[in-house]
Amino acid sequence: MTSPEQLACHLARARARTLRLVDFDDAELCCQYDPLMSPLVWDLAHIGQQEELWLLRGGDPGQPGLLPPAVEGLYDAFEHSRASRVELPLLSPARARSYCATVRSAALDALAALPEDGDSFVFAMVISHENQHDETMLQALNLRTGSPLLAATSALPAGRPRMAGTSVLVAGGPFVLGVDAADEPCSLDNERPAHVVDVPAFRIGRVPVTNGEWQDFIDDGGYTQSRWWSERGWQHRQRAGLTAPQFWRSGGRTRTRFGHVEDIPADEPVQHVSYFEAEAYAAWAGARLPTEVEWEKACAWDPATGSRRRYPWGTEEPTDTYANLGGQTLRPAPVGAYPAGASACGAEQMLGDVWEWTTSPLRPWPGFVPMVYERYSQPFFGGDYRVLRGGSWAVEPAILRPSFRNWDHPYRRQIFAGVRLAWDI
């Protein structure tokens, strides 16, 4: 299990990041930048409410909490849609901050009192929850119009543009998909259990698809020719009037990013594209999207040892030597920027930079057992979702691993999602 000291460090890091993302005036925190997203003050108090529920009340909503039941109910994500939250009588920013601080103080006391052989998983789950909401808040801030509020605090390494458009072979055969709690104590229920699957050989993009490659798709009429699109995807493209990735400006040479207007870097992974756009691009490129099983094999499997790697590059914890994570750069790195982070098959940038769409719907692995927070995965199995893998530049290193499964509706574009191609052989 993760040590109490490590958990305390991860809790502190997550909270410091959260507070940076709400370090604005009350008007900013209480407004809604887009109906797709919550007001930031809702996310802030929801983070505290979930921490209180799981770390101080054992997950029992019937046990009295720090907030009156009617107020606590405002932060139930299943009861109140994102679009409706701006109309709720939410805690003020000052009260939300104070509430989160009170909860955190008690949570640290609970962590300090945890027996040496105590189950620390619930702390890891809460850390994951806060970090995931931090990425959601970054999505909201990117939808905001007006002068910039955020600035990058970390520079990116140079890339190797010649890597764009190249592919690597992933050998066929069995591999271990998923993880067990014994090997990854912080893994969530939909990542478990580990089980052997057989995957035929295929090729996968060495790096994600770039903005420059996507511009070629646009210039070739990719958004105007139905032959590249699925029937549902084409219907959505027409309804939504899609002509380029979200945030690209007319003409496709500039974009907006967190309030900045800038030239579009040709060698940067494309982001803010939907699953429908991703599958259309893949068809145009004479390729396809990978399944999530293929993706995980390309990311984690080492055929030389016949075993999984903890990370694509090995066992070392994620740092900026290996991947662009942690939200400090506010953008993906150019392709080829992290050769040290390559997987055993030679695929690069599989963790960080952009989430990558797969063709897979969200399903439980055989032998799935829900974790203590049963509503994390189960309500979404079988729904209208596609799985995304790999994380983005906005994901905290503490929660990302090759087995981590994200999911969203196939039409979503505000997420930091891009594309990696695959080919049959």
Swiss-Prot record:
GO annotation, biological process: ergothioneine biosynthesis from histidine via gamma-glutamyl-hercynylcysteine sulfoxide
Domain of life: Bacteria
Keywords carried by this UniProt record: Iron, Metal-binding, Monooxygenase, Oxidoreductase
InterPro entries: CTDL_fold, DinB-like, DinB/YfiT-like, EgtB, EgtB_Actinobacteria, Sulfatase_Mod_Factor_Kinase, SUMF_dom, SUMF_sf
Coiled-coil residue spans: none
UniProt cofactor(s): Fe(2+)
The EC number(s) this enzyme carries: 1.14.99.50
Sites where the protein binds gamma-L-glutamyl-L-cysteine: R82, A83, S84, R85, D408, R412
Pathway of action: Amino-acid biosynthesis; ergothioneine biosynthesis
Catalytic activity field: gamma-L-glutamyl-L-cysteine + hercynine + O2 = gamma-L-glutamyl-hercynylcysteine S-oxide + H2O
GO molecular function, one term: ferrous iron binding
Binding site for Fe cation: H46, H129, H133
Known partners and oligomeric status: Monomer.
Function description: Catalyzes the oxidative sulfurization of hercynine (N-alpha,N-alpha,N-alpha-trimethyl-L-histidine) into hercynyl-gamma-L-glutamyl-L-cysteine sulfoxide, a step in the biosynthesis pathway of ergothioneine. Ergothioneine is an antioxidant that protects mycobacteria from oxidative stress.
Family membership noted in the UniProt record: Belongs to the EgtB family.
Protein name: Hercynine oxygenase
Taxonomic placement: Bacteria, Bacillati, Actinomycetota, Actinomycetes, Mycobacteriales
